[in-house]
Amino acid sequence: MRLIQNMCTITEYPPATNTDCGSSSSAGTASSRVIKIAVVGGSGVGKTALVVRFLTKRFIGDYERNAGNLYSRQVQIDGTNLAIQVQDTPGVQINEQNLESNEQLNKSLRWADAVVIVFSITDCKSFDLISHLHRHARQLHPDNRIPIVIVANKADLLHLKQVEPQHGLQLANMLGCTFYEVSVSENYNDVYNAFQVLCKEISKQQNTGTSERRKNSIIPRPKSPNMQDLKRRFKQALSSKVRTATSV
């Protein structure tokens, strides 16, 4: 895993390179496809822990305040080399007007190929934020094709639970999203599975888009003239010349 850069310069980030402490290195190779994922949600729901767990398999309980870092990792899924870039984002509050004016959040959502919305089962306010974030992401991607996944984190803290898992599943179904309940601290496999399925979906979309562009770029060949028609027209022209010569 590599920390690429702070989110404040995300719009300047080139797809095939990264910047780490002033040095440049490749974030993808010529044979790697770039997949960009934005992870969003309320404060303290475990967004950074989720990202680091997926990219490194390690769980770190304490983090500094989220500055909105962009991470990269090379993986292979179904035989395809992927350069996965994951944009961690600072926590947001329940206020649609604040979402619209949150430039950091907007940059991340516009940049992303897919969105992961994280909430904590121990925080009902973070659950209430899901619909706002989902609507905002759809507005920034009016084509409605961007995949959005909802992740319920801290599944191990049952004694602090404020949100029932079935409520998260019901909301995800209503919004047309995939739902995962995970414990970032205790289960890496669930975290990996959520991102793996998402990456497969993005890759499939990219393949479909490439095929459509290739299909649309094919210029249809003009129809070949009918040889019988050409012979008929040639005979007509020849007969006309013969009649003209005879009359003279």
From Swiss-Prot:
PROSITE patterns: RAS. It holds the Pfam family Ras. Residues 206-228 are annotated as: Disordered. The keyword Manganese does not apply. Keywords: GTP-binding, Hydrolase, Nucleotide-binding. Its EC number is 3.6.5.2. Residues 30-248 are annotated as: Small GTPase-like. GTP binds at residues 41-48, 88-99, 153-156. InterPro entries: P-loop_NTPase, Ras-related_GTPase, Small_GTP-bd, Small_GTPase. Transmembrane segments: none annotated. GO terms for molecular function: G protein activity; GTP binding. It comes from the Eukaryota. Gene3D superfamilies: P-loop containing nucleotide triphosphate hydrolases. SMART domains: RAB (SM00175), RAS (SM00173), RHO (SM00174). CDD domains: RERG_RasL11_like (cd04146). It catalyses: GTP + H2O = GDP + phosphate + H(+). PANTHER family: RAS-LIKE FAMILY MEMBER 11. Belongs to the small GTPase superfamily. Ras family. This is Ras-like protein family member 11B. It comes from Xenopus laevis.
